[in-house]
Amino acid sequence: MTFKFRLLFLCFFAFGTSELFSQNISGKVTHEGSPAAGISVIVQPSGKGVTTDYEGKYSINLPIGKFKINFSGTGFKNVVETVVLVNGDEKTIDVDLKQSNLSMDEIVIVGSRSLPRSSANSPLPVDNIDSRTLKTTGQLSFDKALQYRVPSFNTVNTPVNDATTLLDPYEIRNLGPSRTLVLINGKRKNLSSLLYVQFSPGRGETGSDLSAIPTDAIKRIEILRDGASAQYGSDAIAGVMNVILKDKFEYSSLTLNSGVTSKGDGATYGLSYNSGANFAKRGFINYTADFSQQNNAVRSGLIDLTTEIATFGDPSQPVTSPTNKAIADYLAIYPDANNKNGTGEITAAKFSYNLGIPMGENGMFYSNAGFVSKKAISNANFRPSYWRSDAGLLHPAGTTYIGYGPTFEGDLTDYNGTIGFKNEINGWKSDVSLTIGGNSQLYAVNNTVNRTLGAASPTSFKPGGFSFTNIIGNYDVSKSVLENFSVGFGTEIRQETYSIIAGDTASYSGEGANSFPGIRKENATINSRYNIGAYLDASWDINKNFLLNGTIRQEKYSDFGNAFVWKVSSRYKIAGDKLVIRGSASTGFRAPTLHQIYTQSTQSSFVGGSIALSGLFNNRSKQAFALGIPLLKPERSNNYTVGLGFNPTSNLSFTLDYYSIIIKDRIVYSSSISSNDPSSTLGKILANAGVKTIQFFINGIETKTQGLDFVANYKNINIGKGKMSVNLAGNYTIANEIVGSPNDPVAIKDGGSTILNTQIKSLLTESRPKYKIVGGADYHIKQLSINLNGTLFGKTKFQDLDNGGSDMENIKQVFTPAVVTDLNIGYDITKKVNFSFTINNLFNVLPKWKLEAINANGQTVLNNSTAKNLLEGFLAFSGRYRILGYNGSQFSQLGTTFQASLNFRF
């Protein structure tokens, strides 16, 4: 090809391309005369699209041809305009959208297996939260955003992190992470491999890693606040969280964010990219990449000398005695004892995609997947020279030894993926899918020693880790058999595998690596199980106002057998849709997780000249058998909900729901069992089993949880030239209590011990807020948006015997109510660039606690100022955890944080 020919070809191509796309349509989209921003304008069949700017304007260049222009937005009825473009056309299409009584984002999938319904028409309480609402919180992760938007949802960082730095426990209605089922696009998400063992809410349980889901990948969240075991199987006693991923592509988005606390630490950095494409008539791909870094924020307190001497010195001697003077001299130089307690350092990379490929007129092949890689580093308590020696390994020879600070490092990977095919033939809708998922965690402990090994000890250890995987097959069918009657049925087959990975020998030999002992080789194991379940669901609109829904489900597990559950729900509308009365009754179950069945974490020590084991023993161990501890069986629940919804106008809504959840055979992680009397039956059993102390999982209690949820929204309020929406939602716990006495095995009961001491009972029943209320206002005017949100955290209580001793049998540590206020300001710099600034905890409110006596003995202690001060010191580990105490509170200890975000759309 000659140079001239190439030049001619390029000129022709440029001219032809210019002619091909020189046609244009533009216009303005309004609602009741006001500009409608963020409306999707999609061209079919090409799939090309834009969104309207803050003035409601749009513009698209198109080739010659005939097109359908679809205008759609949340809360509005779709409008479709047909346009024919010839060479050089420039056409204007203005559209005024009408408000829809039923927007697409009000359609909820969760809660029914036969027919999706609007949240207003559902017989069940469902929260429907869009991605924008999550982003205005300014929180870095999905789970923390929910904390400040959903009253019945709770999660918080624990001050003593270790493995929980990788993911924090969460729960709905104070029932722990293992009783909330997490779905992604309606498919079960894998559990984490981490079993929470610290004395914080969620102890002895595991849940999914919510922080693994990129916020920019989320279209909306559906939270069903009702038991749903009949629809979905195990783990849905408290409710179901369904994460709906973005699907139809609207625009690409690049978001840069950075933040810092008011103390100048805890810096955060993030980059998120979301994009995709539309193809064919219904095809789409939407994908997200998210990278973030969170630095350490230190909130250590000053050490109280009196408590420190009582812990590490000799309180019977004066401060001038050699032992006590060493402590006093050290704290004079290092008042915080060199501690770096606070949040850990976390680096994360997250990826997600959602794909749909049309197959024929009604078929759709779909696939979605997510992957996250996280690395976390947290600091253990610093070991001052008067607490621990380092055998000369952690400080240079000839220098003064001041102690050492162990660090914990964790590497986490979490993944999930689904492929499936949906189709409709003669009104029968079918969905067949395969889902895989997994979570693995490997740990390292550095800058510490194994004191048993002395000078031969390494200073870095690999303590092992955990892994969990599942493979799930689903087949679901539904049909509207009659105009007012629909059915759904299906099956699920699930296989789960849980692995415990041993650490290196030095990490567990003797007392193990100081601060985080490793997993012993004999405790490492790989175990699997499978289950198959089938359900039948029917929904009957008896008339236009009266709905009745019922579901039954049968499950079979390879390790414990069968489970049968059912659910009925109903809804009655009065005065059209203005007043809705709804209710449900159901039974549920939760299978013990493989973590609870097989986890064993023990350490050895010399007792009476022989080796004795202490720690967590699984229920299949000979030690548990000797104590008469039975194998775990499923929890059983009875759920009841009754509520009403009031919708006087399309802009005003109010719902109130009462719930009651009774859980029988609830699985708990026991107290530490020991015996001071070797001649007792308990003492003999422990001695014969070679056990010093033992803990285990057991179907130990029956619990009753009752409460109220309310939600109120008022939107589209005209204020000046802008519009405002206000919301108020709350959760109030009427009762969260243990019914009757714990199911103590005979040997333990006769030995004067119990599986649940006061501390564990307190943790289960009163360590989450008694109430939580979230209120806010959202105002938009032209390019400016302002969101003000306040969260009232109610009182929590805790009886910390581990740190406070026996005095805490008569005294409670009470965290007082507090309001945390968040402010988010957004501004559209241009049509495609938005700047957002968030101040979380605007007034720098910190958790505050005090001691309250529950009887005369407790009041006697509190009336003695010396005893009271000493007790307060013990609860905060001599002041190391001055803000939270050793075991956490209702909300973050970081105080005010600032977050800035810059978003580009293209």
Residue ranges of predicted features:
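C-terminal beta-signal and adjacent terminal beta-strands/loops
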Residues: 192, 734, 792-802, 827-906
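N-terminal periplasmic accessory domains that precede
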Residues: 90-96, 142-145, 149, 170, ...
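Outer-membrane beta-barrel transmembrane domain signature of Gram-negative proteins
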Residues: 396-398, 404-426, 434-438, 448-547, ...
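Short acidic/polar hinge/loop motifs at secondary-structure boundaries
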Residues: 58-61, 187-225
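Gram-negative outer-membrane beta-barrel transporters
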Residues: 545, 658-664, 668-801, 901, ...
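Short, acidic, small-residue-rich periplasmic hinge/interaction motif at the N-terminus
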Residues: 28-34, 38-44, 72-76, 86, ...
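Short, acidic Ser/Thr/Gly-rich low-complexity loop/linker segments typical of extracellular
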Residues: 47-57
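Extracytoplasmic beta-strand/coil segments of soluble accessory domains associated
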Residues: 126, 147-192
